[in-house]
Amino acid sequence: MTTPTLIVTPPSPPAPSYSANRVPQPSLMDKIKKIAAIASLILIGTIGFLALLGHLVGFLIAPQITIVLLALFIISLAGNALYLQKTANLHLYQDLQREVGSLKEINFMLSVLQKEFLHLSKEFATTSKDLSAVSQDFYSCLQGFRDNYKGFESLLDEYKNSTEEMRKLFSQEIIADLKGSVASLREEIRFLTPLAEEVRRLAHNQQSLTVVIEELKTIRDSLRDEIGQLSQLSKTLTSQIALQRKESSDLCSQIRETLSSPRKSASPSTKSS
């Protein structure tokens, strides 16, 4: 039988360190740069439109205003480029931290799965050993059933040879019960042969192995009980046959004595006459 195994609960995943997964908070300078970049984005549209107008009529009307607008446009572009340069590294760092955390979780899950696989492989090894032992026991029991079946076949042949005597000595009900018992024994032995193949196919099904083994034990016990009953019945039949033969021989001897006694009584009477 399989030995009870303990289910090992997987350990809790490692808690992420605060310093590794903590996203750095933006400083005051970063906030100022962000506000300046947003303001510059608002100004870009206005200054761009005004720059187009300034290029058209700036040198004719007010070249100083055109120079100031161009300077503001260049400053806004420089601020946007600086903001994008600063924030690109921050977003990349955040994405890398998320990927590292997911990789740690995946690594932990893989280690837990490896431990479970090793535990299941050990359980399967012990189950296969127990199954081989049960199969050997079952085949030995089946061989014993076949030997007993051969003995019952020889006994049945003896009963067939003495059919006439059995009909005279015993009733038809006892013979019918004996035939029914032998037929049921044959059917159960035929049923055991596909069960042996079923046991081989069920080697990979661990959950149903215990149920199949219990059923086989029940069938084996029932067959043993029936074999014991049949052996007891055969003993009783043998004793009854011997008793009936003895009674018949006694009856025959009595009949012979009664038949011979009138002859003896008749012989003295003839002499006296």
Curated annotation (Swiss-Prot):
The chain crosses the membrane at residues 41-61, 64-84. It is found in: Secreted; Host vacuole, Host pathogen-containing vacuole, Host pathogen-containing vacuole membrane. Changing L90P: In strain: C/UW-1. Its main location: secreted. One of its GO terms (cellular component) is extracellular region. Residues 1-20, 254-273 are annotated as: Disordered. It comes from the Bacteria. It is a multi-pass membrane protein. Keywords: Coiled coil, Host membrane, Membrane, Secreted, Transmembrane, Transmembrane helix, Virulence. Residues 172-233 form a coiled coil. Changing G180D: In strain: Da/MT-566. Forms homooligomers. IncA proteins share the same general organization: a short N-terminal domain, a large bilobed hydrophobic domain, and a C-terminal cytoplasmic domain. Belongs to the IncA family. Chlamydia replicate within an intracellular vacuole, termed an inclusion. IncA is probably involved in the homotypic fusion of inclusions. This is Inclusion membrane protein A. It comes from Chlamydia trachomatis serovar D (strain ATCC VR-885 / DSM 19411 / UW-3/Cx).
